[in-house]
Amino acid sequence: MTTALGIDIGGTGIKGARVDLTTGELVSERIKYPTPEGGHPGDVLDAVEALLSDLGGKAADHTGICFPAIVTHGITRSAANVSADWIDFPAAATFAQSLERDIHFVNDADAAGVAEAQFGAAQGVSGLVIMLTLGTGIGSAFLIDGTLVPNTEIGHLEIDGSSAERRASNAAREREGLDFEAWGLRLTRYLSHVERIFSPDLFILGGGISKQHDEFFPFLEIATPIKPAALLNNAGIVGAAYLAGNALLD
């Protein structure tokens, strides 16, 4: 069995596990730490180091880390719901040096999309699949015939005078006390806008709230088919591990 470690850094939590790269299944306990207040790189690095120790990770393990930012060549180019210190930060090199292992850094929604393409709801789907992760913000991944187009960031599209994630993320639902019907109307407004621009063949909705898709899918009224993420909130972990295992084996 070939495995790799996947770490998913979010605005509120950092979680990780060992992943079977053939099946996409977690083959260890999933461990979660709270994201340190302020989300500064050094503090997050310390939390990741502790998490890897809990997982029994070794320097030889392929290790992927997904993060809520545009990531190019291992450098985080933006910062969503974390410290601005991440902007233009050499994340992969810094983490690799401190953790004494090769690190593959990737955008969190892109990792989730790759996981769904390899093992989940987008497996074998042709055409354009748009995956949206509904959490602290709205992440996005575009997959064309299963191939990732990275760093799309369409959660920042403007809807009704505000960014989509300010109005339609799961955090917005919780912050404003919206019931699922009211939230579904906001999601429909956003999804309809995305649909008009990109004409996707399938939407996949992920993030922790996807476990409750039966509660809000009935209120989503768009023409494009919609599926919940098959890997639920583990998709980032699985995708990060898969990308690390394949990138570092090349």
Predicted regions: what they are:
Residues I103-D108:
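General beta-strand structural signal in soluble alpha/beta enzymes
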Residues T76-D88:
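A charged helix-plus-loop insertion that forms the helical arch/lid used to bind
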Residues I138:
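Basic- and aromatic-lined ligand-binding clefts that recognize polyanionic substrates
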Residues M1-H62, V71-I75, F95-E100, A115-I130, ...:
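ATP-binding/phosphotransfer module of carbohydrate and carboxylate kinases, centering on a glycine-rich
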